[in-house]
């Protein structure tokens, strides 16, 4: 009997459908190589595309399908066409994350191929060997705390940073479980501002310390102030190798800073997870939302030059974390590496290949890898 997985696909806006097409090419080849697996794709609209058709940024039917699926794939959301809407179309993504209860965002920071080291914003001697997994808490903190807008006078406004023990415990367990999936376990560096802040400072540090000591004593835990971490990320990022754990706002900022290291924002995948993988397991079956970290890129959408690697590597993350197909994920990563190493890449990283040519090359590399085995 075949193992069945349902995947909800949101192409999204502008360049989103372009990169999604390449991600699905790769996924189709993975299904071909695994005859005991059946992948059912359900397509829905989100963001501006959903607004144009349905008059809302995401439909109830789409949310229902997503919350019962094995995983969700997303291209990109939003753009200038809908910039003046009273309700931002990007809120569709927020509604999707909330419906899924996606609480932990994962962003790997590394080089998909050795040849990319020369494309980094950092000197090769500084960035070579960077291997970081940023785990960002998504449900609490200043983005969701009570706020007071100014009254039009621009005199005063406020945002309140609120965290609960439960929120911090959950994301700490996620970071610990991901660290334990490697042998030996990865170090965990927790970022905070414990010298001046209460919520994402002293509370954060205290709860993280308790959980790690009680549940993950094998793991080396390091605490670092967020401003110090930002400096280290720019000067010597390998000092942060392992899992970097951060609150919502700090994780938002440090992950964007880190995205400059691999050479192009188009290279980087992400996952937003809804539960915690089993301790010490390299692959799992937990629901997650997978998307490249780049935006909808309206300036280059439709030109056939958008980098699809972030989307393709997001598919690899989905295979590993939601479909329990770790070997397939490893094959995708190897195919991406092989493709980039022979110079087949988009203009953002110095190549001349189109979006579809890169996708086709990754699929061809996947076929070669499969045939070798």
Swiss-Prot record:
<feature type="binding site">
    <location>
        <begin position="284"/>
        <end position="289"/>
    </location>
    <ligand>
        <name>NADP(+)</name>
    </ligand>
</feature>
<protein>
    <recommendedName>
        <fullName>3-isopropylmalate dehydrogenase AMT6</fullName>
        <ecNumber>1.1.1.85</ecNumber>
    </recommendedName>
</protein>
<feature type="binding site">
    <location>
        <position position="227"/>
    </location>
    <ligand>
        <name>Mg(2+)</name>
    </ligand>
</feature>
<dbReference type="GO" id="GO:0005829">
    <property type="term" value="C:cytosol"/>
</dbReference>
<dbReference type="GO" id="GO:0003862">
    <property type="term" value="F:3-isopropylmalate dehydrogenase activity"/>
</dbReference>
<feature type="binding site">
    <location>
        <begin position="77"/>
        <end position="79"/>
    </location>
    <ligand>
        <name>NADP(+)</name>
    </ligand>
</feature>
<feature type="binding site">
    <location>
        <position position="252"/>
    </location>
    <ligand>
        <name>Mg(2+)</name>
    </ligand>
</feature>
<feature type="site" description="Critical for catalysis">
    <location>
        <position position="143"/>
    </location>
</feature>
<comment type="function">
    <text>3-isopropylmalate dehydrogenase; part of the gene clusters that mediate the biosynthesis of AM-toxins, host-selective toxins (HSTs) causing Alternaria blotch on apple, a worldwide distributed disease. AM-toxins are cyclic depsipeptides containing the 3 residues 2-hydroxy-isovaleric acid (2-HIV), dehydroalanine, L-alanine which are common for all 3 AM-toxins I to III. The fourth precursor is L-alpha-amino-methoxyphenyl-valeric acid (L-Amv) for AM-toxin I, L-alpha-amino-phenyl-valeric acid (L-Apv) for AM-toxin II, and L-alpha-amino-hydroxyphenyl-valeric acid (L-Ahv) for AM-toxin III.</text>
</comment>
<keyword id="KW-0028">Amino-acid biosynthesis</keyword>
<dbReference type="InterPro" id="IPR024084">
    <property type="entry name" value="IsoPropMal-DH-like_dom"/>
</dbReference>
<comment type="similarity">
    <text>Belongs to the isocitrate and isopropylmalate dehydrogenases family.</text>
</comment>
<dbReference type="GO" id="GO:0051287">
    <property type="term" value="F:NAD binding"/>
</dbReference>
<feature type="site" description="Critical for catalysis">
    <location>
        <position position="193"/>
    </location>
</feature>
<feature type="binding site">
    <location>
        <position position="97"/>
    </location>
    <ligand>
        <name>substrate</name>
    </ligand>
</feature>
<keyword id="KW-0843">Virulence</keyword>
<keyword id="KW-0464">Manganese</keyword>
<dbReference type="InterPro" id="IPR019818">
    <property type="entry name" value="IsoCit/isopropylmalate_DH_CS"/>
</dbReference>
<comment type="subunit">
    <text>Homodimer.</text>
</comment>
<keyword id="KW-0460">Magnesium</keyword>
<keyword id="KW-0560">Oxidoreductase</keyword>
<dbReference type="GO" id="GO:0000287">
    <property type="term" value="F:magnesium ion binding"/>
</dbReference>
<dbReference type="GO" id="GO:0009098">
    <property type="term" value="P:L-leucine biosynthetic process"/>
</dbReference>
<comment type="pathway">
    <text>Amino-acid biosynthesis; L-leucine biosynthesis; L-leucine from 3-methyl-2-oxobutanoate: step 3/4.</text>
</comment>
<keyword id="KW-0479">Metal-binding</keyword>
<feature type="binding site">
    <location>
        <position position="136"/>
    </location>
    <ligand>
        <name>substrate</name>
    </ligand>
</feature>
<dbReference type="InterPro" id="IPR004429">
    <property type="entry name" value="Isopropylmalate_DH"/>
</dbReference>
<keyword id="KW-0100">Branched-chain amino acid biosynthesis</keyword>
<feature type="binding site">
    <location>
        <position position="256"/>
    </location>
    <ligand>
        <name>Mg(2+)</name>
    </ligand>
</feature>
<comment type="pathway">
    <text>Mycotoxin biosynthesis.</text>
</comment>
<dbReference type="Pfam" id="PF00180">
    <property type="entry name" value="Iso_dh"/>
</dbReference>
<keyword id="KW-0520">NAD</keyword>
<keyword id="KW-0432">Leucine biosynthesis</keyword>
<keyword id="KW-0521">NADP</keyword>
């Amino acid at each position: 009997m075949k193992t069945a997985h349902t995947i909800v696909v949101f192409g999204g806006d502008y360049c989103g459908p372009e990169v999604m097409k390449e991600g699905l090419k790769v996924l189709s080849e993975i299904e071909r190589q695994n005859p005991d697996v059946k992948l059912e794709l359900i397509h829905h609209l989100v963001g501006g595309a959903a607004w144009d058709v349905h008059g809302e940024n995401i439909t109830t039917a789409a949310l229902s399908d997503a919350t019962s699926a094995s995983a969700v794939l997303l291209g990109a959301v939003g753009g200038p066409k809908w910039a003046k809407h009273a309700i931002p179309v990007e809120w569709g993504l927020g509604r999707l994350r909330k419906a899924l209860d996606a609480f932990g965002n994962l962003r790997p920071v590394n080089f998909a191929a050795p040849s990319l080291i020369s494309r980094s914003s950092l000197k090769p001697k500084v960035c070579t060997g960077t291997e970081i997994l940023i785990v960002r808490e998504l449900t609490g903190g200043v983005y969701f705390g009570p706020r007071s807008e100014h009254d039009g006078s621009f005199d005063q406004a406020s945002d309140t940073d609120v965290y609960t023990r439960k929120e911090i415990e959950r994301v700490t367990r996620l970071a610990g479980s991901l660290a334990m999936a490697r042998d030996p376990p990865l170090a965990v560096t927790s970022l905070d501002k414990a010298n001046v802040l209460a919520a994402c400072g002293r509370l954060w540090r205290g709860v993280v310390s308790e959980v790690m000591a009680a549940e993950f004593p094998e793991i080396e835990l390091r605490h670092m102030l967020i401003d110090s971490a930002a400096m280290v990320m720019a000067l010597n990022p390998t000092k942060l190798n392992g899992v970097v754990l951060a609150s919502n706002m700090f994780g938002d900022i440090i992950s964007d800073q880190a995205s400059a290291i691999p050479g192009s924002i188009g290279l980087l995948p992400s996952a937003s997870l809804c539960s915690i993988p089993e301790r010490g397991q390299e692959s799992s079956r937990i629901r997650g939302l997978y998307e490249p970290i780049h935006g909808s890129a309206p300036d280059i959408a439709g030109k056939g030059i958008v980098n699809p690697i972030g989307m393709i590597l997001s598919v690899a993350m989905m295979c590993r974390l939601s479909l329990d197909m770790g070997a397939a994920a490893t094959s995708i990563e190897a195919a991406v590496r092989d493709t980039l190493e022979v110079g087949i890449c988009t203009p953002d990283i110095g190549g001349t290949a189109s979006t579809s040519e890169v996708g086709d090359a990754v699929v061809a590399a996947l076929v070669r890898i499969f045939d070798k085995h």
